[in-house]
Structure formats: structure tokens, C-alpha cells
Amino acid sequence: MRYNDKELQALSRQPAEMAAELGMRGPKKGSVVKRRLVKLVVNFLFYFRTDEAEPIGALLLEHCRVIHEEPNSFSISFLEDPERKYHFECCSEEQCQQWMAALRQASYEFMRRSLIFYRNEIQKMTGKDPLEQYGISEEARFQLSGLKA
């Protein structure tokens, strides 16, 4: 997916769901851990040099895995290239768990599945499709398409 640099910079300035200085090591062999300001905004994880306002990179959190690594650290890898991992070091195990939970819930796919799950629960309780009033109940994006919510 391609993004306009100005759009990404504008998005990076939006209020963050989470933000902290973390240790970060990129996927290149031999890369070292560097302190980065890391911001979660919608489904993007932006990272900044600690003394700069513009991001130096962004990860789109779709089709990715968030994995707990050694104590106080986690990694993000992408399904199309699982060997390419970004490692993050937190100040505590509690902070690590908070980041992992937030990152796992940040993807569009997670939100779509949650909507489908709660839509079905409401329909079971009320007998009515809550999306019907908006005229979108038959749209493909709100269907399971063979996958369980």
C-alpha cells in the first residue's frame, strides 16, 4: 500500500492511543537497540527520534503478529515476511503487556471481527440486525466470508 508522506505526517500528529519511549531494533542484521518515541495512532505505529517532531518511520499494523519475547520485550513481524522483525524493549513487563494488547487490537481486521461478533450478539438478544437501520447490513465487509469472528 502506498501513502502520501504529508498524509502520514499529519496522521502522526493526531492524538495517540498509546505513546512512550521504548528501545527499538529494526529488522536489519546487526542493527542495535535505539531509544525511540513510539506512538500508536489508529492502525499505524509511528516511531520518532526522541528529539524530533517528524516520524522516521511507520508500521501499518495489518496482517502482523505481535509476539512476547524475552522479559519486557516484544516483536512485530508481518505475515508476508515473518523473518523481518521489529523488536521493542519496554521499561516493565506491565508496560510490555499493555503495548502488546493495544497493538493486537489496532488492526482494521480486529475491529471488523469485533463489530461482526457484537452485531451477532445483539441480533441474538433482540432478534434485529443493528446494522439494518443504517442500510449496510448486507455489505460484504460486514460478513464473515467463511471465517469465524
Swiss-Prot record:
This is Pleckstrin homology domain-containing family J member 1. One of its GO terms (biological process) is endosome organization. It comes from the Eukaryota. Residues 15-108 form the PH domain. One of its GO terms (cellular component) is recycling endosome. SUPFAM superfamilies: PH domain-like. It comes from Bos taurus (Bovine).
